[in-house]
Amino acid sequence: MEIQKEKLSPMMQQYFALKEKYPDCVLFFRLGDFYEMFFDDAIRISRELELTLTGRDCGLKERAPMCGIPYHSVDMYLKRLVERGYKIAICEQLTDPATTKGLVERDVIRIVTPGTLIESNLLEEGANNYLCSLYFEEGGDCGLCFADLSTGDIIALLPEQKNLEANVIDALSRYTPAEILMNEDALLLKNVMEFIKIRLQCVVTMRDAECFSAERNHDFVCHQFQVPELSYLQLPETGSETAAVYGMMDYIKETQKNQIARFISLTVNDDDAYLGLDFNARRNLELTETLRGKERKGSLLWLMNTAKTSMGKRMLKTWIEQPLVQPAKIMARLDAVEIFVKKSVVLMEVRSILDSVYDLERLMTRVLYKTATPRDLKALATTARQIPALKAELEKVADRKLLARLLSQISNLDMVADLVDRAIVENPPVSVKDGGVIREGFHQDLDYLRGIMNGGNQIIEKMEQSERERTGIKGLKIGFNRVFGYYIEVTRSYYDLVPDDYVRKQTLTNCERFITPDLKKTENDILSAKEKALRLEESLYVEVRDCLAAQLKQVQETASAIAQVDVLAAFANVAIENQYTKPEIAMDGVIQIRGGRHPVVERMLSDDIFVPNDTYLDNKANRMLLITGPNMAGKSTYMRQVALITLMAQIGSFVPADYAKISVVDKIFTRVGASDDLTAGQSTFMVEMHEVSDILKYATPNSLVILDEVGRGTSTFDGVSIARAVAEYICNSRQIGCKTLFATHYHELIDLEHTIEGVKNYSIAVKKHGDTIRFLRKIVPGGIDDSYGIEVAKLAGLPEKVVKRARVLLRQMEQQIAAQNQKPEQSDDMQYNFAAMQQEQAVQMLKKTNLQELSDAECRQVLEEVTNLLRG
């Protein structure tokens, strides 16, 4: 829309001056009680939010398109826009319209983006909202920084250069950012860009190289974290991870308008400290959401999430997404869980106390960003009052090193509780502007002003009685309205008694209203007392809030420690409820599970009893368990169960088993299930091959690999060949040699047990009664050479006629194959098996095709069809 800006009204010129500074944002322009949008913003957002599009005079011939939202409902609209990827610049009135002559001063105080949200009602309680900064230089490293503005978490990491793109994708999968900042060179990471576009589907914000530079950000970052040099943060002076931190802090400073005191410490993560889980493993194991419905219920997080606090819920999700690989740290968590399990009374008391603990992290964020309400401060005080009781209970289990350390990190926060209790009333209003927030006795001047306010009615009543006596007007009344203030009202029958010092202000049908100098003076005293009291109360509230902000470091450390205690207690609670056992952590390469169960499937079964299974894997004779059996028999559930038990052990949780010895693995890979990746334009088979390729590239001898039905997305011969080659490669100790669970319906692979060291055949037990089967869900040694496909089809509900016809065809095929194997000398024209028929089709196709008349592309198509026929 072309606009002659010089002809615009002063207010519209002010609007455009701000809009030009933030061209990629929707500008919420504060006008009184509304945020207004104009011109293109108004047209676009009125459609998005289904708002009425109106107009406003702007100095031009045509009215400016306009739509608006009430300022008190802004969060609801922000949420909808941010979810759709919009960035919003919040423009506030900086001067009071009532006292400002001319144009009200306005400026943008904050930019709201998907990655910079701090409002609790716009965020998921149990999940972090990460902003990511990604910096890459062609031919160099890739640095990453993740920050959650709502909690103050900020993490920097440098993915390993080897397999760089895969490592970057793993990190993005772990933190699932809502928004990613990146420099131009980052676009060269093609696989990463594809992952962001197809899988994460988050907002990407391109930033100039200067935003990641030391020249612009070094001093600012050092000042922010209060360090003389970057080495104190374990950051190199130069490096991609440092550039990523620069880019992060630059963007936060820009969007929050320098309000970034929330970040006081930075964590530099070592990727090697955590179990490697790529996107497919996280998805297939259903760690935080189900594979099909993308729902929380049915995931491992849903099962484990009995944490009492919001901080604990977020910490639990982080632990599930970042299992440990250092045995000492794993065992420290397990020991802490064990003592809670043994001392169940202490566990019950701790969890009861945690029920009254509020979200310290996000409360302090609102304190720091000056948006905390009086009720937020009371929530801080309520939490602070719970801490002595919590520490007293933790003293009873402090013989465990981890719990002793966490206990030492929890501060009493007496100052927080005392200050808030002295300053804020018991049940404060939502906003300090409503008054009645500061407790009586906290400040002498405020008490004095309130005395005048509260005595105002008595003063007016006395004056009313005095004027009646002085004038003899028995019906004289003193009233108040917002236009005239206080007034004296006299009815017509007493007009002759009105004294000369009464000044007429308003004539009504049956009465006149007057004022006097004494009445105006009294009015000024009363009204100014109210205004002064509100201003003083707001000032005192700001002082209290700022005093609490100074306690940030103490509160932050306390919040982190309480969150960890909450997760450990939740682990103990889940272990008791579900009869889990403490796993033995080992480093000898053995994974041994007796009576193992799938944690989620077991919980979801309402009436059925889950059938437990044993597992034994090592790095020698039992590297690969080759599992055969019909579909629906439970192969996939069993393999996922082994992976989940391993993962649960490495997050420090008890596991669903009678006994478990878990040797720490460095990575878990899964190739499970089949679903066409239509958004990527790839078939089931192509997706499967990509996933298998990644496993073969990145698995190590210390990895755990889960492979389900490799090769089923193509022809039988191709599928068998690929499956066998993959199994041989993984099991070969000179190639990978890692622990693997390999489920297949290709019975031809059973002989691998006799040809490759480390392969052991297992199968799902099936009980057959005539033409029906029953799955026993039990893993037993030995392979089977019957897939029971027709029986499974019958169970699935295929019509009986179709099932019978399938049996007839199966017998015919088996007879033909047997005849072919018995009579290899038989002439071609006597063989009526499928292979011969397909060969004949290929010959006839070639005879009928004149290659001279075909283009190169058409020749290739014919060749492909012939090849497919010959392959079967």
Named regions from a protein language model:
Residues L508, E512-D546:
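Extended, charged coiled-coil "arm/hinge" scaffolds of SMC/Rad50-like chromosome-maintenance ATPases
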Residues M1-I339, M348, S352-D355, D359-L368, ...:
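Charged catalytic and DNA/RNA-contacting regions of genome-maintenance
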Residues F39-D40, T238, K308-T309, L316-W319, ...:
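ATPase nucleotide-binding head domains, primarily ABC-like/P-loop NTPase cores
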Residues K5, Q13-A17, D24, R545, ...:
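Conserved phosphate-binding elements of NTP-dependent enzyme cores
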Residues Y369-E393, V503-C511, T581-P583, G589, ...:
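Short secondary-structure subsegments characteristic of cysteine-rich extracellular domains
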Residues C91, P114-L123, Q259, E395-L402, ...:
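Active-site phosphate-binding and catalytic loops of NTP-dependent enzymes
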Residues Y369, T373, T383-Q386, R405, ...:
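Charged, surface-exposed helical/loop "interaction arms" that form contiguous linear patches used
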